[in-house]
Regions:
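Structured beta-strand/loop patches that form or line metal/cofactor-binding pockets in enzymes
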Residues: 1-44, 49, 326-332, 381-383
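Conserved, mostly hydrophobic/aromatic
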Residues: 3, 34, 41, 64, ...
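Metal- or metallocofactor-binding catalytic centers and their adjacent structured scaffolds
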Residues: 5, 37-114
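Glycine- and other small-residue-rich loops at beta-strand/loop junctions that grip anionic moieties
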Residues: 100, 138, 164-168, 194-195, ...
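Catalytic pocket of metal/acid-base enzymes, prominently hydrolases
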Residues: 108-142, 357, 361
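Metal-dependent enolase-superfamily TIM-barrel catalytic cores that perform enediolate-based chemistry
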Residues: 124-237
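Extended hydrophobic packing segments that form well-structured cores
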Residues: 353-383
């Protein structure tokens, strides 16, 4: 089996509501869908994360494509080595990682199809018999709106509730209080400040809000670099600290682990350049006593499925992984993935990623991108 063609299709799908944090304000997700066609007619699917600029990811993927053509898609690691070393993407690591992760998914999809096995089996088989658990992503809202969001999520079975903070202290506190009142004392609350606070403010707010509302963990409360800032905060508070920003490469992620700066690492194959790197660093984090929470920048079903395979293989007992499937207006897969409507997701039986892309939806949301451009991270277009 050899790779004949690589197609790159940027698409935009709106959120049900705007995503608003201390860093971003956007109305939907724009990513680059990857379609890798093999000489036997098989198709592998992937999804590149856009980050700041979609067209730069398209350009990066185009630059990487010559290293794929004519190669066996099962030779993932040697292709990656050529892309980053001969293609010099090791000098543009974050863009390279965001791009390569999507190509990597497509190659692994083809490898699984050729083997007749779901990807999680190629990644080592089930790490646990438990289904993978995902969180409820709450929108910043009025008290009434948050009560409604929480009631629907509790009815659907969610145990982990996540909300963005770091914008307005009083408003943040009101929303956390609303969530705790709505979900009861047993369910978990996680907050994400996206590096909004200086160290003294972070220490004060975390202590106060944990005493009042019992926080499960706090994500990115302070800047991730230098690592000692997070490490100092971790010594000053009793709440587990989660790192996300600052995990932009294999080296940075390893530094966060060895620097004892966080209790939880929130990242994905996008951050570290491919599924094997994500698996390796997740295992390394586990050996160091950390938990791993799968991160999402906002994703379509392709990326969600790919990472579900990885989480099935990891099986480290972490719960409440990140997802945006439940807050997207639509998807491009023919069948809804389970986490569109519920928090739990079990085995995937079909070979490779085990997905079928809806050609009409793919075309529709590609045309939406062509007409309106990407959902910019600083310009929400829906309420």
């Amino acid at each position: 089996m050899k790779i004949e063609r690589v197609d790159l299709i940027p698409i935009s799908i709106p959120y049900k509501h705007a995503e608003v944090s201390s860093r971003v304000s956007r109305g939907g997700v724009t990513d680059v869908v990857v379609r890798v066609v093999a000489d036997d007619g098989r198709i592998g699917w992937g999804e590149c994360c856009s980050g700041a600029d979609t067209l730069s990811i398209v350009a990066a993927a185009q630059a990487m494509t010559p290293f794929l053509i004519g190669r066996d898609p099962r030779d993932v690691q040697s292709i990656k080595r050529d892309v980053f070393k001969k293609g010099l993407w090791d000098y543009r690591v974050q863009t390279g990682n965001f791009t390569w992760a999507g190509l990597d998914m497509a190659l692994l999809d083809l490898a699984g199809q050729e083997a007749g096995l779901p990807l999680w089996r190629l990644l080592g088989g089930r790490g646990s018999t438990e289904p993978v658990s995902y969180f409820c992503y709450l929108a910043r809202d009025t008290s009434e709106g948050l009560r409604r969001q929480c009631a629907e999520a509790v009815a659907a079975g969610y145990e982990h509730f996540y909300i963005k903070v770091g914008i307005d202290e009083a408003e943040d506190e009101r929303m956390i209080a609303d969530v705790r009142a709505a979900i009861g004392p047993e369910r978990k609350i996680r907050i994400d400040a996206n590096e909004a606070w200086p160290l003294p403010v972070a220490a004060k707010l975390i202590a106060r809000w944990d005493a009042a509302f019992d926080l499960d963990f706090v994500e990115a409360p302070v800047r991730a670099r230098p690592v000692k800032v997070m490490a100092q905060l971790r010594q000053r508070v009793s709440v587990p600290i989660c790192a996300n920003e600052g995990l932009g490469s294999e080296t940075e992620t390893l530094e966060m682990i060895t620097g004892d700066a966080a209790d939880v690492l929130c990242f994905s194959s996008y951050w570290v350049g491919g599924m094997q790197s994500f698996m390796t660093l997740s295992r390394t984090a586990e050996l160091a006593g950390n938990k791993v929470c799968k991160h999402t920048h906002g994703e379509f079903g392709i990326a969600a499925v790919a990472h579900q395979h990885a989480l099935l293989a990891l099986g480290d007992g972490s719960r409440g992984h990140q997802q945006t499937a439940s807050v997207m207006e639509d998807d491009i897969l023919q069948s809804d993935i389970p986490i569109r409507t519920q928090p739990l997701w079990g085995e995937i039986d079909a070979p490779g990623l085990g997905i079928t892309v809806d050609a009409d939806k793919l075309d529709h949301y590609h045309k939406l991108f062509l007409a309106d451009g990407q959902f910019l991270p600083w310009a929400a277009t829906v309420e």
